[in-house]
Amino acid sequence: MRPRGFVIAARGSSDHAALYAKYLFGRRNRALVALAAPSLFTRYGSPPRLDGQCVIGISQSGASPDVIAVIEEAVRQGAMTVAITNDPDSRLASVAELVVPLHAGPERSVPASKTYTASILALALISQAIDRDDAFGDALASLPSRMGGALGAEADLEELVPVLCGPRAIVLGRGFNFSTAEEVALKLTETSYVLARAWSVADFEHGPIAVVERDFPVLLVGAGGSVQADLESIASRLVDYGCRVIGLFDAPNAPPGLDAAAVHDSALPEELTPLTLAILGQLLAYRVAVARGVDPDQPRALRKITRTW
């Protein structure tokens, strides 16, 4: 039976994958997606009604107690449940009705990298399974070569590094790549100790833009498509303010006036460009961490499995 909508529980990088699903399922499947507030299920003990919903838990380890709690409650309420995890033997997988194993292999770094892109791909495959489309299916089949091709822009990342080596930065995206902006900001923060904050371009203009000043570092992440005009508009405005504006783009070209940009045109539909851009964002965060003298695989104060309730 087709669910009325989706509720997705996740934390950290997995939460950004859930944000991606909000746009993907909304556009391709015309489904309403809600991101769960796990504390309603744990600390407050007042879970919302989940009847008619497909409840998805995303956790690379499958051991996040709050994500598990959401799925357990969904099972109690009789909702359809799905676990997306890199450990098919995990507690999360054992609780859910359906399991989508990522098969990404061991992830040795503390920050999520390949499990993040694998989670995005899993969500895209679920979307395709619900509403099949030949063109989207062909694009999915081409992903290995398209993602490999994105590495051709890796050398261009070096020009972006000096702009991001300060103590703070803003990362902007919109639409499908708002989730990518969130993920890149997290990677810069946790691997490089740069206090990076992500915003949707639209939300940024509703107040946060007041923080910018001359030489303020701003990273734009985008793929053209339906939001191209928004990216070009904010880029022009920030350049006029004297900000140091750089970009990661899966598109034929970058907006004019940027200090530097890494550009790769995968020719993928906009819905799938978060996969190529996530890879470039991870490599950028790695280079910034090395430039700042930080081990990006073992950031201080972090654990591979974070247990929150």
What are these regions (language model features)?
Residues 216-224, 277-278:
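Hydrophobic membrane-spanning alpha-helices of multi-pass integral membrane proteins
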Residues 267-309:
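Peripheral docking tails and interdomain loops at the edges
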Residues 184, 231-235, 277, 300:
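Composition- and surface-driven signal marking solvent-exposed, interaction-prone regions
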Residues 1-3, 98-217, 227, 292-309:
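Active-site phosphate/pyrophosphate-binding segments
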Residues 2-145, 149, 174, 221-267, ...:
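Glycine-rich phosphate-binding loops that contact phosphosugars or nucleotide phosphates
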Residues 18-21, 181-183, 187-190, 278-283:
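Conserved phosphate/anionic-ligand binding catalytic regions in large, soluble enzymes, centered on
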